[in-house]
A protein has these predicted regions:
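Conserved glycine-rich cofactor-binding loop
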Residues: 7-8
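Short, small/polar-rich loop/turn modules that mediate ligand/substrate recognition or access, typified
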Residues: 160, 165, 234-236
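Alpha-helical segment proximal to the catalytic Tyr-Lys
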Residues: 112, 157-158, 232
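Substrate-binding pocket helix/loop in short-chain dehydrogenase/reductase
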Residues: 80-84, 88-96, 204
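A short, exposed helix-loop element centered on a Lys and neighboring polar residues
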Residues: 107-108, 153
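Catalytic loop of short-chain dehydrogenase/reductase
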Residues: 123-147, 152-161, 173-174
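Short C-terminal tail/terminal secondary-structure segment
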Residues: 81, 212, 223-224, 230-231, ...
């Protein structure tokens, strides 16, 4: 199986969850993390480019001949200052390449082999930002994740009869190492406690009814379930994992 963006945060939690269950796991990122697990296959690549995607596909095909499980976890954006009008065409394209086109290109490369074997699972990791963008500077990211959701639903119907299940998981505020760094920065800048800084972030997104951020391991558990035979009748669903942040049904 392949987990994109699998060296830290949610991706690392997913990779370690599957590896602990005995799966052969490959991860990708632009560079390995300092704590890269030696038991995981690692491919360095910039998936925001076609060349990067091609390099990963070639490496996986040479190593395993294809995939049974593809977790399109990679997602990234910047938050430039200013309003929506400051988001340039180049910025939009970069965000779309990473958050939408990388999954599209990887799916296009690996799903045909899954269809030949009549077995496969594809899970796209989205974000609740596609429902509720937290700020103007995240509009490109939110739009890309919204497009990924539409694509994921359509793709699921196209390949389900061939034995390939496609689903999506859209996390809310998950306290990864990166998110914890943001909490620490807010704590220092505002001269408040860590708990107060964490609550400040939670309030920024409209609050979390369960009273805490999510953990990467909680996302990994849902992904593991969706990749298992226990979810064999689940197709084309987008699971919001947000502690109740999104107030609508």
């Amino acid at each position: 199986m392949l987990v994109t963006g699998g060296t830290k945060g949610i991706g690392a939690a997913i990779a370690h969850r599957f590896a602990a269950s005995g799966a052969q796991v490959a991860t990708t990122a632009r560079a390995p993390s300092a704590s890269q697990d030696a038991d995981l296959m690692f491919v360095a690549a910039d998936l925001g480019t076609t060349a990067g995607v091609d390099a990963v596909v070639k490496e996986i095909e040479n190593k395993w001949g294809g995939l049974d499980i593809l977790i399109n976890n990679l997602g990234a954006t910047a938050t430039p200052p200013g309003g929506f009008e400051t988001l340039t065409d180049a910025f939009w394209q970069q965000v779309l390449d990473i958050n939408l086109m990388a999954p599209v290109r990887l799916d296009r490369a690996f799903i045909p082999g899954m269809l030949e074997r009549k077995n496969g699972v594809v899970i796209h990791i989205g974000s609740i930002a596609h429902i509720m963008p937290p700020s103007q500077s995240t509009l490109a990211y939110a739009s890309a994740k919204g497009a990924l959701r539409t694509y994921s639903k359509g793709l699921s119907r196209a390949v389900a009869a061939g034995g390939v299940r496609v689903n999506m998981v859209s996390p809310g505020f998950i306290e990864t190492s990166g998110a914890h760094g943001m909490i620490t920065e807010i704590q220092q800048n505002r001269h408040i406690s860590e708990d107060a800084a964490r609550q400040y972030v939670m309030n920024m997104i409209g609050g979390i009814p369960v009273g805490r951020p999510g953990r990467p391991e909680e996302v990994a558990e849902l992904v593991a379930f969706l990749a298992s035979d226990r979810s064999g009748y689940i197709v084309g669903v987008d699971y919001l994992l947000d502690g109740g942040t999104i107030p609508t049904v």
